């Protein structure tokens, strides 16, 4: 049980610009719901909750000076679009206690209990009333500490969010030398509403539905659950080796990556567990960081959303029975990733900015069971990799986190790839339908 003890608003400790920040289509198409994550710490010495809370409030107020947009609010401007008013309304910080021990949460898979470790956001309120950043400090019975963070996805992607979180942690440790973030969203291509798309943007046309169904309504209503799966470095390396053994004889490109091998393996296991017919179209939606794919590249400390999605589509039968096996699936994924270049990004942006209403194109809402946005569940998957994010740098003074992950996964088919310990292992939190999850886990390990 988690008991909320107090809550307060934290504002920047110094005056900050009172401006309305333009949000490009790369921001606009993201969900305005909050991505909930939490960090778990086991301090070596006993920490007073009140002292930790006061320190966090102070350091947060200082961190909100360079990251002043997070103290603002969204305002609707029509057409399913928003602007970001940097009005210093502030972030919210919450103090909580739990009568549980860290070991009671097992592998920390996203459940109704872990959801309570991140701040609750009341989506019954108008978007303009919602803080963009909420934080929850939870002290556990065993002395462990949890920091739950909920940040509106429409203002930042994972890399931008971690820029803020690591800055805040650094300030809380008493360190100096903060690197200033880059907030000017006009650096991302603004788009030309008169230009016609030059590429085939599968993800903007809609996603496959089950054969015999006219829509995803029936699948969206089915019960889902989560699992937390683990791959050792040896298992990941084995998948990579397996994928590269399946390359065509005339293939001359670079080796398939760990990410491509894991993604292909997961896609095959899902199609198998879902018992798709051979002719069933299935898609794998992948989130791509575009910072270095745009021309010119974005500044390294760009704080907004610089990701776009790209989608692979294939028949389930071919994924499972092609003679090249995992190598074939990786070739499909490779083509999907490699096409995301400067022209592809700008073509997608031109399409989005030409739409009168962006609402039909917004997806990935974080609240479990949401009926909003594009459905990415059966027969589809949506994958995001957090490998490469500086998770172990989030040290508030209690040492490195012993765990970091999501408190919730919003929908069927959603999964993450999270780095494990500093040994090349990974953790895969995934949400699937109850009818499919056991078989998926079985194939996930058996088919390596």
Curated annotation (Swiss-Prot):
Tissues of expression: Highly expressed in root and rhizome. Expressed in senescent leaf and callus tissues. Expressed in detached leaf treated for 18 hours with ethephon, methyl jasmonate, salicylic acid or illuminated for 24 hours with UV light. Not expressed in mature leaf. Expressed at low levels in leaves and flowers.
pH relationship of activity: Optimum pH is 7.0.
Coiled coil ranges: none
Temperature note: Optimum temperature is 30 degrees Celsius.
UniProt pathway annotation: Phenylpropanoid metabolism
InterPro entries referenced in this protein's UniProt entry, alphabetically: CAT-like_dom_sf, Plant_Fungal_Acyltransferase
Residues the record marks as active site: 153, 395
EC number(s) per entry: 2.3.1.-
GO biological process: alkaloid metabolic process; phenylpropanoid metabolic process; response to jasmonic acid; response to salicylic acid; response to UV
Catalyzed reactions per annotation: (2R,3S)-piscidate + (E)-4-coumaroyl-CoA = cimicifugate K + CoA; (2R,3S)-piscidate + (E)-caffeoyl-CoA = cimicifugate D + CoA; (2R,3S)-piscidate + (E)-sinapoyl-CoA = cimicifugate J + CoA; (2R,3S)-piscidate + (E)-feruloyl-CoA = cimicifugate E + CoA
One GO molecular-function entry: hydroxycinnamoyltransferase activity
Pfam assignment, any one: Transferase
Gene3D superfamilies noted in UniProt: Chloramphenicol acetyltransferase-like domain
Enzyme class: transferase
Recorded superkingdom: Eukaryota
Keywords: Acyltransferase, Alkaloid metabolism, Transferase
Function of the protein: Catalyzes the formation of cimicifugic acids. Uses hydroxycinnamoyl-CoA thioesters as hydroxycinnamoyl donor substrates. Has a strict specificity for piscidic acid as an acceptor substrate as none of the various other acceptors tested including 4-hydroxyphenyllactic acid, malate, spermidine or tetrahydroxyhexanedioic acid are substrates. Donor substrates include 4-coumaroyl-CoA, caffeoyl-CoA, sinapoyl-CoA and feruloyl-CoA. No activity with cinnamoyl-CoA, isoferuloyl-CoA, 3,4-dimethoxycinnamoyl-CoA or 3,4-dihydroxybenzoyl-CoA as donors.
Family listed: Belongs to the plant acyltransferase family.
Protein name: Hydroxycinnamoyl-CoA:piscidic acid hydroxycinnamoyltransferase
């Amino acid at each position: 049980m988690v008991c909320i003890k107090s809550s307060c608003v934290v504002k920047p400790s110094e005056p900050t610009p009172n401006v309305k920040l333009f949000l490009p289509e790369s921001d606009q198409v993201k969900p305005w719901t909050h991505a909930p994550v939490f960090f778990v710490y086991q301090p070596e010495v006993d920490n007073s909750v009140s002292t930790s809370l006061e320190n966090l409030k102070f350091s947060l107020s200082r961190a909100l000076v360079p990251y002043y947009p997070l103290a603002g609010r969204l305002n609707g401007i029509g057409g399913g679009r928003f602007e970001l008013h940097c009005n210093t309304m502030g972030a919210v910080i919450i103090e909580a206690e739990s009568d549980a021990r860290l070991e009671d949460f097992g592998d920390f898979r996203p459940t109704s209990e872990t959801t309570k470790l991140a701040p609750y956001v009341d989506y019954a309120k108008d978007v303009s009333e919602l803080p963009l950043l909420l934080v929850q400090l939870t002290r556990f019975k065993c002395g462990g500490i949890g920091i739950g963070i909920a940040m509106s996805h429409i203002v930042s992607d994972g890399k931008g969010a971690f820029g803020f979180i690591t800055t805040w942690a650094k300030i809380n440790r008493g360190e100096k030398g903060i690197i200033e973030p880059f907030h000017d969203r006009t650096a991302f291509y603004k788009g030309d509403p008169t230009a016609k798309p030059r590429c085939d943007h599968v993800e903007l046309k809609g996603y496959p539905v089950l054969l015999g169904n006219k829509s995803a309504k029936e699948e969206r209503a089915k019960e889902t659950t989560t699992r937390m799966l683990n791959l050792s470095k040896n298992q990941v390396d084995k998948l990579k080796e397996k994928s590269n053994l399946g390359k065509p004889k005339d293939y001359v490109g670079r080796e398939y990556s760990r990410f491509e091998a894991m993604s292909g393996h997961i896609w095959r296991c899902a199609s198998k567990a879902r018992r798709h017919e051979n002719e069933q179209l299935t898609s794998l939606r992948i989130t791509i960081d575009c910072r270095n794919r745009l021309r010119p590249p974005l500044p390294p400390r760009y704080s907004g959303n610089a990701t776009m999605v790209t989608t692979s589509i294939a028949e389930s039968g071919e994924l499972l029975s092609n003679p090249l096996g995992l190598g074939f699936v990786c070739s499909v994924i490779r083509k999907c990733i490699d096409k995301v270049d400067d022209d592809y990004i700008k073509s997608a942006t031109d399409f989005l900015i030409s739409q009168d209403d962006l609402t039909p194109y917004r997806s990935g809402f974080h609240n479990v069971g949401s009926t909003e946005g594009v459905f990415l569940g059966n027969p589809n998957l949506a994958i995001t990799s957090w490998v490469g994010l500086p998770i172990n740098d989030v040290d508030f003074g209690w040492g490195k986190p012993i765990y970091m992950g999501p408190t919730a996964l919003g929908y069927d088919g959603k999964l993450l790839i999270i780095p494990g310990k500093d040994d090349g292992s990974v953790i895969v939190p995934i949400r699937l339908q109850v009818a499919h999850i056991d078989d998926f886990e079985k194939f996930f390990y058996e088919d390596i």
